[in-house]
């Protein structure tokens, strides 16, 4: 029997996207008694098939029905006509390498690091004359950060001397430093780089009906145990409270009323080729920094000729990501990292400087080196010789990474490429991305610090990711920025669109700046705030 994907009558809210932004809003509004419908372009992934996905990830060439192949994108079914895109910037942008369309969104394969933005991130223009200011400050978001940490089940500690002020402890204790963290510790102390724990959205002890982390070490791209947070938890809560979540229902456009000021319906397709209109009193876009833009542009009309909610011309502009900088190599003693799949220590000492350079977050990577399976499959030797090679190449690696901030630049943007279409005949997103001189300078500076750490350890450097080799961390931000001036921004401080009374936008696309902190906790905090405001608006 075919699954029912017909629209829901009398919906209060239609949410587009079932990643963390949409799922948190859905759960909170459904639990408040509102009629909620969630539409997502991707499928539901069966929790029982996570072991098969793990096998596909660890064993190249093993392909399961659920996995679609051994690659990160293949594990979650990304690629093909449905997910087509183009990249026309000065740096190619591999969009599908780190996004997932499906119930749970990109939390299905994220690493799970969740730190708060610093106070300077909200006041970059006022403090340093660069970037932009947020229309809200850290104090406005602070209580919602605490809510978000409880919602995600964050394991952390108050040991970061550079962190913004807190109001309560993290819900779970921090994970202890890894063995390789202890190797870095003396070098960092000598260089006056205080190390501290990393807040993680993974259970250090049982929480929210999920077990503690058991150390598979494959957090990215798949956590078989369920200890790492995924938005599936909030989807389950939303459905338990009466929300309806429809998968494989890609929204084609948003239809508005005669005056163009209110959204009437989200028009979505189904696998059977039907097209439906989901009407609702309010609509929340929560499908990421690329697809939020694409849907607004696809919804162009006589009333909104440049795209919905785009009277400012800012929709799609100011696309930001975090750039990676790193140094890796080997040391003459075991690092014992094979059981760790996430970061347990980092350093924010380079973040809040007085100069106007982008922020930098140092990360001590629990990197054990290339997989022994892959090494063995590609080796030319056998037997004891192969074993000696594997022992020499595995478990002695060290790496120090960094996330480096990008300032918002209008020329970095998401547009529609009308020369290429998806499986429904719609123009695909085009990503135009480049790295500015200030970010290149910050990468050069952090590379110097990373090299100094290796020199202090007397470790050999095998590779460096610098300004020319940098790539994205796949944190899509800034493309529907918030602000108080409708001529310069897309949404107001409450994340409601300036141009449409009943349209809210959730997620990192509303960030005016991105700092150098992983964005998901801020996404979750803003989603808690949106749900509170929307609950009041619905009455």
Model region roles, listed by residue range:
Residues 79-82, 197-201, 207-208, 212-222, ...:
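A glycine-rich dinucleotide-binding beta-alpha-beta segment and adjacent secondary-structure elements
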Residues 62-79, 86-87, 92, 113-116, ...:
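Conserved redox-cofactor binding core of oxidoreductases
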Residues 28-31, 35-37, 41-56, 240, ...:
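Glycine-rich loop(s) and the adjacent beta-strand/alpha-helix scaffold that form part
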Residues 1-13, 31-32, 60-61, 528, ...:
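Extreme N-terminal leader/targeting segments of oxidoreductases
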Residues 80-99, 103-106, 110-111, 134-138, ...:
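FAD cofactor-binding and catalytic pocket of flavoenzymes
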Residues 513-532:
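A conserved FAD-binding loop/helix module that cradles the flavin
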Residues 7-21, 285:
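Beta1/beta-strand and adjacent pyrophosphate-binding region of the FAD-binding site
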Residues 43-70, 100-109:
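Conserved N-terminal glycine-rich FAD pyrophosphate-binding loop of Rossmann-like flavoproteins
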């Amino acid at each position: 029997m075919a699954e029912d994907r017909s629209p829901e009558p009398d919906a209060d809210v239609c949410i587009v996207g079932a990643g963390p932004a949409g799922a948190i809003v859905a759960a909170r509004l459904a639990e408040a008694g509102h009629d909620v419908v969630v539409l997502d372009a991707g499928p539901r992934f069966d929790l029982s098939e996570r072991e098969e996905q793990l096998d596909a990830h660890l064993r190249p060439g093993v392909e399961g029905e659920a996995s679609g192949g051994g690659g990160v994108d293949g594990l979650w079914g990304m690629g093909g006509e449905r997910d087509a895109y183009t990249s026309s910037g000065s740096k190619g942008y591999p969009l599908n390498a780190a996004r997932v369309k499906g119930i749970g969104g990109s939390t299905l394969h994220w690493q799970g690091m969740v730190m708060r933005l610093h106070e300077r991130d909200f006041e970059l223009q006022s403090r340093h004359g660069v970037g932009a200011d947020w229309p809200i400050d850290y104090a406005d978001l602070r209580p919602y950060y605490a809510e978000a940490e409880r919602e995600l089940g964050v394991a952390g500690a108050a040991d970061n001397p550079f962190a913004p002020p807190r109001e309560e402890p993290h819900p779970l204790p921090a994970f202890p430093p890894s063995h390789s963290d202890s190797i870095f510790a003396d070098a960092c102390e000598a260089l006056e780089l205080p190390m501290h724990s990393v807040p993680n959205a993974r259970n250090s002890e049982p929480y929210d009906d999920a077990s503690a982390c058991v150390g598979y070490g494959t957090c990215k791209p798949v956590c078989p145990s369920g200890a790492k947070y995924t938005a599936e938890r909030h989807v389950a809560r939303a459905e338990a409270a009466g929300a309806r979540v429809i998968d494989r229902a890609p929204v084609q456009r948003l239809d508005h009323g005669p005056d163009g000021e209110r959204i009437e319906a989200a028009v979505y397709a189904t696998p059977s080729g039907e097209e439906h209109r989901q009407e609702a009193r309010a609509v929340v876009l929560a499908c990421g920094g690329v697809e939020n833009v694409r849907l607004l542009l696809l919804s162009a009309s006589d009333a909104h000729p440049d795209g919905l909610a785009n009277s400012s011309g800012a929709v799609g502009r100011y696309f930001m990501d975090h750039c990676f900088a790193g140094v890796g190599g080997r040391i003459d003693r075991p690092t014992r990292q094979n059981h760790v799949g996430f970061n347990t220590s980092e350093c924010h000492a380079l973040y809040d400087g007085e100069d106007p350079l982008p922020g930098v977050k140092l990360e001590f990577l629990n990197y054990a080196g290339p997989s022994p399976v892959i090494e063995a499959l590609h080796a030319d030797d056998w037997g004891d010789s192969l074993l000696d090679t594997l022992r020499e190449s595995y478990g002695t690696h060290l790496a120090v990474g960094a996330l480096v901030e990008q300032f918002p630049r209008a020329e970095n943007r998401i547009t529609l490429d009308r020369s290429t279409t998806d499986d429904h005949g719609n123009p695909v997103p085009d990503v135009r991305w480049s790295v500015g001189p200030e970010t290149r300078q910050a990468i050069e500076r952090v590379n110097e610090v990373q090299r100094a750490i290796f020199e202090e350890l007397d470790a050999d450097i095998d590779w460096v990711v610098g300004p020319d080799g940098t790539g994205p961390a796949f944190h899509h931000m800034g493309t529907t920025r918030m602000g108080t001036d409708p001529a310069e921004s897309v949404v107001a401080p409450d994340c409601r669109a300036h141009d449409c009374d009943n349209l809210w936008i959730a997620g990192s696309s509303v960030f005016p700046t991105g700092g150098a902190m992983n964005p998901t906790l801020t996404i979750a905090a803003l989603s808690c705030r949106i749900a509170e405001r929307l609950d009041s608006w619905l009455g």
